[in-house]
């Protein structure tokens, strides 16, 4: 076989060279020579893109129209400004030995509104699921260089691309569901695959972010009937049009490159996924997952959680408009000091994090006070826990209070339950409260009793404690205790809800998944965890808190809760109707109103910030962040524990009749909380 003539450096034969010369026309490449656009592709890829575009136009399998071709992995798509490309936006992207075909404008011309992704969305989604080496090179380093001349400007390859381009005009866009498909063509095997593309709300070309405003923050509770008695959802998870592959996929997954089934789990059919969001010089991993009885259900639940995480990390649906000091805003804004601040020692050890000052200008977003029934400005960092700029995050919030639902009322209910749950857990842990123990065998739910028995089969006793402190809302602390006292000793969880059965099941779900894994994780990470047990200052991250309690030597810090063996009380007795229980309605609006009344009646406000992503709204979902200033916030990292400095930590147990006096510093648990 005679090798092709490569003297021109293109890897193409004479006939192909002629076709390219005949068909080539000037095209608008993503990289411009005058420097006004994004950085250009390396010359080798720029030439390859021009040649492929020319062959596509000349291909008998195509339509004869001009097609823009661009390279991926040659510039930072997550930071560059949009390039007005009009109808010549790239419909073919090349990278490695692959070609991505699409996305395409809708036939009715509705391309830049209504949630139809553009080629820039594809480039951004593609980059977001690449490996760290490539992302660091594009986003932090000096970029990438071509390893050689791409050999793909040959007719039999471009004919395949052209056929896919032509085929899209015959497809019914509705057949793909809520999101359109792009096609991945392997240029070595010609194998083609379809991948769903979710629009990027932050896309500078077609993103649907809207300016934040007090009008947009207005919030009115409306009827939200539950889909069945005993549920606290307006519809079951199965009713959402939720294509998992659109969110967890290796090409352009909106929530990461894939979802993993934990086939080794001995309790639930757990799944886990992860996406990475840049925070300065490092990529922050954000995990999401589901813990149901089947992997299919766990995948769907996990995607919903992943969307909730993405919505709460930074303002993707709305763009903040207010930057001012608290002193300038006055009572139009929430004073973040009511939510707790770090000690001076933290800021001395972390000088990059600038402490809050009333005179310092910060970014604010609009929320809505359900108590005062008015819009209220809230510090961005209290709502979006990965807001840009580490130095601006005078506190590092978490997803506490962030929740999703099929209606705003559903989302508010679950967000408020989470805030109440974390507050009660921290009060009990740091206040070393003696809590009534619940008999799980008195549960009316056979699934609860069966899971407790399953944990016992694997060597764990599941124990549950009534953790109601201030509010008439059932909160249950769940603990899985390894019965032989070995590594993987303790595993904690919690649940809250107006239905005590649901609250107990929520805590059980957490420990059922984690308990069967904590032994192996604690053994693998034993050296680091033992260093934490000896010096709590080394407890730095979220996972450190639960994992360190996998060590037997940490069990003594939970003896206030687990060391005594009183009677286990039946649920019917503990949760009998009365002053410490709220009635349950068939409508979530009524449930929310009763809960808000209980919280505001105790002297607190309830603030709601709408975090809903455009793609969530397209699916009929809503996400909110619920903030109750004055309740204890959950923090991760021993130096960050705001709860220990807040007035409520000293007064709440006494006010609830659980302590004879207010707590002093030496009354508090000296060990980090074990909340997962």
Where are the predicted features?
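Alpha-helix boundary/N-cap detector
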Residues: 40-43, 47, 446, 590
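Small-residue-biased low-complexity repeat regions
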Residues: 5-17
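Helix-biased "structured C-terminal domain" signature
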Residues: 2-4, 20-26, 73-78, 82, ...
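Residues on a specific face of well-ordered alpha-helices
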Residues: 116-120, 124-127, 159, 163, ...
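Internal hydrophobic alpha-helix adjacent to the cofactor/substrate pocket in enzyme cavities
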Residues: 157-173
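Intrinsically disordered, low-complexity coil segments
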Residues: 105-116, 169-179, 389-390
